[in-house]
Curated annotation (Swiss-Prot):
Belongs to the TRAFAC class OBG-HflX-like GTPase superfamily. OBG GTPase family. This is GTPase Obg. Its EC number is 3.6.5.-. CDD domains: Obg. The gene is obg. GO terms for biological process: ribosome biogenesis. It comes from Beijerinckia indica subsp. indica (strain ATCC 9039 / DSM 1715 / NCIMB 8712).
């Protein structure tokens, strides 16, 4: 499936139905009076967060969406039916912005969450609505109210338990394909991964979602190599697994490059829990591995893990560390969401 994390769409809610101009016609009743019903309300345009989606690719092929118009009112005081809503199905993590691309309208992060983007127009009043003691036969009815129209931006930030970050060709895609059923493109050259990939990792009786973020380079926070869009996906990850290629020139410098970009992007990316690992250790000799581990340890100020997805070396330890970090991050989020307990005293 192709990946699309940004789309521009045009929406319009339904117009309200017109009120009816009608009079009661029955045998032996000469002046039956008005009986025109009201028009139905137009349909709304609603964005709904659904499961089973992880891309906005559907909005590449259709960008115009319109809800149905309300039915016109009818005689015998029959009101028109309400117009059908237009439902925009989006994946969890979708943000909806105004046409300027900066004003946030909604942030849909949970399955089942919805937001009304454009409200349908009200139906017009039929002539029965205008009957008074001094005007027994009104000959007026209102047209329906026009619907709302607007242009919006949809932006997707993938929601995952853990995210893989690192320089291009650090072994992220190989790691994801080894520990999950995801099958990203893998090749021995930089920028093989051009779009974020999601995989479900099963470990024991537990499962968690792992995101492979395309390789970041220096200047990513300024948009170099589409890095600013890729960094946006990191925002929704609870934990980061930072992979550093053991075969790179200097593991410490490679680590600091990514940390610098996370800090420069902001939004707390550099404050997220992080597990550091030296990857592709099967590609270097023992002496090089020792030197790279020492450099990475000095830069990260912690003892990094070392692994090889190709030979399945230390994958179990890495997944255990990831699960522990995910659980700790989840507990911290729940604790922060709970209201602070207040002590009660009868004299207060």
């Amino acid at each position: 499936m192709k990946f699309l994390d940004q789309a521009r769409i045009y929406i319009r809610s339904g117009d309200g139905g017109a009120g009816c101009l009608s009079f009661r016609h029955e045998k032996f009743i000469e002046f039956g009076g008005p009986d025109g019903g009201d028009g139905g309300r137009g349909g709304d345009v609603v964005a709904l967060c659904v499961e089973g989606l992880n891309t906005l690719i559907d909005y590449r092929y259709q960008q115009h969406f319109k809800a149905k118009t309300g039915t016109h009112g009818m005689g015998k005081n029959r009101a028109g039916a309400r117009g059908a809503d237009c439902i925009l199905k989006v994946p969890a993590g979708t943000q909806i912005f105004d046409e300027d691309g900066e004003t946030l309208i909604a942030d849909l992060t949970e399955i089942g969450q919805s937001v009304c983007l454009a409200r349908g127009g009200n139906g017009g009043f039929g002539n029965a609505h205008f009957k008074t003691s001094t005007n027994q036969a009104p000959r007026r009815a209102n047209p329906g109210q026009e619907g709302e129209e607007m242009t919006l931006w949809l932006r997707l930030k993938l929601i995952a338990d853990a995210g893989l970050v690192g320089l291009p060709n650090a072994g992220k895609s190989t790691f994801l394909s080894t520990v999950s059923a995801a099958r990203p493109k893998i090749a021995d050259y930089p920028f093989t991964t051009l779009h974020p990939q999601l995989g479900v990792v099963a470990y024991g009786d537990r499962e968690f979602v792992l995101a492979d973020i395309p390789g970041l380079i220096e200047g990513a926070h300024e948009g170099v190599g589409l890095g600013d869009r890729f960094l946006g996906h990191v925002e929704r990850c609870r934990v980061l697994l930072h992979l550093v290629d053991a075969g790179c020139e200097h593991a410490g410098k490679a680590y600091k490059t990514i940390r610098k970009e996370l800090a420069a992007y902001g939004n707390g990316l550099d404050e997220k829990p992080e597990i550091v690992a030296l990857s592709k250790i099967d590609t270097v000799d023992a002496e090089t591995l020792k030197n790279q581990m020492a450099r990475l340890k000095r830069a990260a100020k912690r003892t990094p893990l070392k692994l090889s997805a190709a030979t399945h070396t230390n994958l179990t330890e890495t997944l255990q560390s990831l699960l522990a970090a995910i659980d700790a991050a989840g507990a911290a989020q729940e604790a922060a969401a709970e209201p602070a307990a207040t002590s009660w005293h009868p004299c207060d």
